[in-house]
Swiss-Prot record:
GO BP field: cytoplasmic translation
Assembly behavior: Part of the 50S ribosomal subunit.
Protein name in UniProt: Large ribosomal subunit protein uL6
Assigned GO CC terms: cytosolic large ribosomal subunit
Gene, per the UniProt record: rplF
Coiled coil feature spans: none
Length: 177
């Protein structure tokens, strides 16, 4: 059995969890998330805890049980506390601006880049060079942040581009004569 799957997921007060076959729905103050659990994983609910055990006859059961536990734990944290991801724009003239449900980015191209935010994700710009993404779905937050970063990835010589707040860009040395 996976080491991750051995630990049960505790369900805090104010969170409603519904298990319908292999479909798990978690509802809390930040919204509602649902996910289909792999058929090789058996989910048991008892007194405010969920346990995940691998089923016999499946090769991938051990790995899937740990994955399922981690995903459900992220869902519970997402609907209670939520997740945030911070992006920083580094470069002369690089700016971000909120326009309703979209982010307008000036990234050195001849045109502004507009990125529409999916449902469940909110953004704020504390300054022109910072973007803070918030939401309940950890995977979706990471995907939106990666999509925005992909418009202008940090280049290795000056470090200009869109980067995560905790990202360290290794700067290469310029060519010498």
């Amino acid at each position: 059995m996976s080491r991750v799957a051995k630990a049960p997921v505790n369900i805090p007060a104010g969170v409603e969890v519904k298990l319908d076959g292999q479909l798990l729905t978690v509802k809390g103050k930040n919204g509602e998330l649902s996910r289909k659990i792999h058929e090789s994983v058996e989910v048991k609910q008892d007194n405010g805890q969920f346990t995940f055990t691998p089923r016999e006859g499946f090769v991938e059961a051990n790995a899937q049980s740990g994955t399922a536990r981690a995903l459900v734990n992220a869902m519970v944290i997402g609907v209670t506390e939520g997740f945030t991801k911070k992006l920083v724009l580094v470069g002369v003239g690089y700016r971000a601006q909120l326009k309703g449900n979209a982010i307008a980015l000036s990234l050195g191209y001849s045109h502004p880049v507009e990125h529409t935010l999916p449902v469940g994700i909110t953004a704020e710009c504390p300054s022109q060079t910072e973007i803070v993404l918030k939401g309940a779905d950890k995977q979706l937050i990471g995907q939106v942040a990666a999509d925005i970063r992909a418009y202008r990835r940090p280049e290795p010589y000056k470090g200009k581009g869109v980067r995560y707040a905790d990202e360290v860009v290794r700067i290469k040395e310029a060519k010498k004569k």
